[in-house]
Amino acid sequence: MDEKEEREFILNATNSIKTTCGRRPVGWLSRYLHTENTRRLLVEAGYKYHMDDYSGDVPFIDSEHPELVVVPYQLDTNDMKLWLNAGYTPDMWLKYAKDTFETLYREGEQSPKMMSLGCLLY
């Protein structure tokens, strides 16, 4: 999508959430990948954090947009595995999530780590 379409998409989503919930969101997580314009457009729209980043497990400040915190999102701990793979059970997902947490907890002794759990409403 071009910049104008993306700006409209962000503003429409923001207004929809504000209308439905009574207040506007301060963070952005979209099912779409971001473009080279997304973070700037989010800052323009008043957002404080952006979660469409899959590059790591430590939040960071975007050097081009220092008013925006980038909060990584880990796809591997998303429960979508349950509906993408018929043989994947909730217990298997929970074990994977616990193992991931334990690994990041150990690694966190040396440097900060963060873990996200994506839980979908089925």
PLM region spans:
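Catalytic alpha-helical scaffold of carbohydrate-active enzymes acting on polysaccharides/glycoconjugates
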Residues: 1-27, 32-69, 94-117
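Surface-exposed cleft-lining segments at the edges of enzyme active sites
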Residues: 24-25, 80-91, 119-122
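A structural motif
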Residues: 63-81
